[in-house]
Amino acid sequence: MSVERTLMLVKPDAVRRNLEGKIIAHVQEKGFKLVALKKLKLTKEQAQQFYIVHKDRPFYDELCEFMSSGPIVAMVWEGENAISRIREIMGATNPEEAEEGTLRKLYGTNVGENAVHGSDSPESAKVEIPFFFSRLEIVE
């Protein structure tokens, strides 16, 4: 096992419903350390840049529109196998298919408004974390 860092976003749908505290507590209760946190609102251009890997997918425009529709909470979590374990905690992309007790099952409403985003690989985390946080903003 290795200690990893991963990015997690609380999406606008969950922020609108004031769920960020519950989501943070849920992840902390699983033993992860929160090493960076900020609330911000992406412009559509920033959302397009962040999700550039999906630019050829049919949902890209809708995703970018949604992610720039309201505030988000960006976080960096640290822990053993954080990337895969936090993805398990988040659950399947579609809340209807997510396991009971996962964040998306608890707080997602549909495949687009599914409450959270998380890095899907070490390579993604290396790109996604610095998109939102400078080294000075990540507390050891």
From Swiss-Prot:
Biological-process GO terms, alphabetical: CTP biosynthetic process; GTP biosynthetic process; UTP biosynthetic process
Domain of life of the native organism: Bacteria
Cofactor(s), names only, from the UniProt record: Mg(2+)
Catalysis: reaction(s): a 2'-deoxyribonucleoside 5'-diphosphate + ATP = a 2'-deoxyribonucleoside 5'-triphosphate + ADP; a ribonucleoside 5'-diphosphate + ATP = a ribonucleoside 5'-triphosphate + ADP
Main location: cytoplasm
Active-site annotation: H117
Compartments reported by the entry: Cytoplasm
Single annotated GO MF: ATP binding
Signal peptide: none
Entry EC number(s): 2.7.4.6
Binding site for ATP: K11, F59, R87, T93, R104, N114
Example of a GO cellular component annotation carried by this entry: cytoplasm
Gene3D superfamilies associated with the record: Nucleoside diphosphate kinase-like domain
Quaternary assembly: Homotetramer.
Family: Belongs to the NDK family.
Function in brief: Major role in the synthesis of nucleoside triphosphates other than ATP. The ATP gamma phosphate is transferred to the NDP beta phosphate via a ping-pong mechanism, using a phosphorylated active-site intermediate.
Record protein name field: Nucleoside diphosphate kinase
Protein encoded by which gene: ndk
